[in-house]
């Protein structure tokens, strides 16, 4: 299994005197649940018994030309909840760093956008270029950074 491969890789790294294992994880994938985050955390805790772990977390952003190009954005609220689950479960076991969920939403809107979103970028930048400026400009086009059903998991 993948977990067995990761454990073997960590053992090999330890034998080679590599000091730290860096892992990358994406949250917000279609169908992802809190249970999935708990399982990921359990695996990272197991790996941390072999080596110190640095865990980088990014939020899924669908891209044109990929199999998941039409997948919706999970929602800032859902991604935050999943990252919080990981941070809590890995406290003292792994160094956890997450990229900005808010800017991942902006990236998501732009990745699937059209000329209208391009004009919204112009408007947001003219107003200052903060996340709030982007959110307001994109919300005028019907984009929302939060999930339709934040409790669904």
Please describe what each predicted stretch is.
Residues 47-51, 84-95:
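Structural alpha-beta junctions
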Residues 19-25, 53-58, 96-98:
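Hydrophobic faces of well-ordered beta-strands that scaffold small-molecule active sites
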Residues 73-87, 117-126:
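Acidic, Ser/Thr-rich peripheral helices and adjacent loops at domain boundaries
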Residues 12-16, 54-59, 148-151:
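Short, compositionally biased low-complexity segments
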Residues 35, 51-53, 59-61:
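Contiguous mid-protein beta-loop-alpha structural module that forms a pocket-lining wall or clamp
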Residues 25-31, 59-63, 100-104:
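Active-site-proximal loop/turn and secondary-structure-junction residues that shape catalytic pockets
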Residues 1-49, 65-81:
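Conserved non-cysteine loop/helix-boundary elements of the Radical SAM core domain that shape
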Residues 91-153:
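Radical SAM enzyme core and accessory elements
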């Amino acid at each position: 299994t993948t977990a067995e491969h990761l454990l073997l890789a960590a053992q090999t790294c330890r034998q080679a005197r590599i000091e730290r294992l860096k892992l990358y994880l994406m949250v917000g994938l279609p169908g992802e649940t809190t249970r999935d985050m708990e399982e990921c955390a359990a695996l990272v805790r197991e790996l941390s018994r072999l080596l110190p772990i640095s865990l980088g977390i990014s939020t899924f952003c669908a891209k044109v030309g990929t199999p998941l190009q039409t997948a919706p954005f999970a929602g800032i609220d859902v991604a935050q909840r999943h990252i919080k689950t990981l941070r809590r479960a890995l406290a003292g076991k792994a160094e956890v760093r997450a990229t900005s969920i808010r800017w991942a939403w902006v990236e998501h809107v732009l990745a699937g956008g059209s000329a209208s979103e391009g004009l919204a970028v112009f408007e947001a930048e003219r107003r200052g270029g903060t996340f709030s400026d982007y959110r307001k400009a994109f919300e005028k086009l019907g984009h929302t950074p939060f999930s339709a059903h934040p409790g669904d998991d």
